[in-house]
Amino acid sequence: MSEVTHRTKTRPVKVGPLTIGGNNEVVIQSMATTKTHDVEATVAEIKRLEEAGCQIVRVACPDERAANAIADIKKQINIPLVVDIHFDYKLALKAIEAGADKIRINPGNIGRREKVEAVVKAAKEKGIPIRIGVNAGSLEKKILDKYGYPTADGMVESALHHIKILEDLDFHDIIVSMKASDVNLAIEAYEKAAKAFDYPLHLGITESGTLFAGTVKSAAGLGAILNMGIGNTLRISLSADPVEEVKVARELLKSFGLAANAATLISCPTCGRIEIDLISIANEVEEYISTIKAPIKVAVLGCAVNGPGEAREADIGIAGARGEGLLFRKGEIVRKVPEETMVEELKKEIDKIAEEHYAKMEAEKAKANA
């Protein structure tokens, strides 16, 4: 293939109840930071990720203790569980048997062909996919010897090698990631991969850094990739609470119109005209809407003169003035509210719009099932 395979044209792959690929949705993932064998801590963290909007979660499986915990974890969570395996095919078999919704392996590094065959056979029987995880930092020696250092071509060659191992065993429920910590390398690798095969792509800039630096780096790299129509699922990798990964992912997808059920905040950068504590209000509203699963655009603006006009596209918003605020919908002023209650009034209006959306969705669902 010489053209980029758009995300809508990729091969659909089921992960639990979700479909990755074959549509325009980009599914948000994260990874638990807990020791997987600590079931209570792992489940608690996954529950926080679920609440933040994470749709798929991955856990490490470095040993038998971790593998033995998978079944208990799976029973207590509501989103698909991916198990990350390196080298030991027996751990992959245990994870599959325990109910993993997907496993992440590189077929070429778990041993002889019969070991790969055993994993593929188990995955087929359970109907679960395999993610091939190519990483610029851990390319095979023969590829590094060939190219001299990690390159996009080398990463694609590695991916195709692992894909062929699975395809030769008549296994096609495959998702591929092409991660690198270098932004330009990642962009090039994903673009070349999207031209080389039509399997769904899991996006990520690996080892991107701390909350601030990693957010900027991930947004720069993944934004460029998403803008090419590439990517079916993604994880923002941060040295931070994984809930922050989900928040950043949601904001990134919203920026490209790829998050259908997420609220968006518009807020002004402030200037000498503002008469309210806009920064703290904007932060409070942003936190409030972070878990709302409805396509609501909310505005928080500091100037009552220009505010409503500037946020004409917002569903609901407030513009501050001295001692009061203007509450408006679609750019039209609804009413004036006292400054001390304007945030609470805004929250009430947000809730109303969200409830209207939920009711509409339920009605459409009922009609479709009738």
UniProtKB/Swiss-Prot annotation:
Record carries keyword Magnesium: no
EC nos: 1.17.7.3
Coiled coil regions, renumbered to chain: none
Annotated organism of origin: Bacillus pumilus (strain SAFR-032)
Protein function: Converts 2C-methyl-D-erythritol 2,4-cyclodiphosphate (ME-2,4cPP) into 1-hydroxy-2-methyl-2-(E)-butenyl 4-diphosphate.
Any one GO molecular-function label of the UniProt entry: 4 iron, 4 sulfur cluster binding
Protein name: 4-hydroxy-3-methylbut-2-en-1-yl diphosphate synthase (flavodoxin)
Pathway: Isoprenoid biosynthesis; isopentenyl diphosphate biosynthesis via DXP pathway; isopentenyl diphosphate from 1-deoxy-D-xylulose 5-phosphate: step 5/6
Positions with a binding annotation for [4Fe-4S] cluster: C268, C271, C303, E310
Gene Ontology biological process: isopentenyl diphosphate biosynthetic process, methylerythritol 4-phosphate pathway; terpenoid biosynthetic process
Family: Belongs to the IspG family.
Record-linked Gene3D superfamilies: Dihydropteroate synthase-like, Sulfite Reductase Hemoprotein, domain 1
Pfam family, one: GcpE
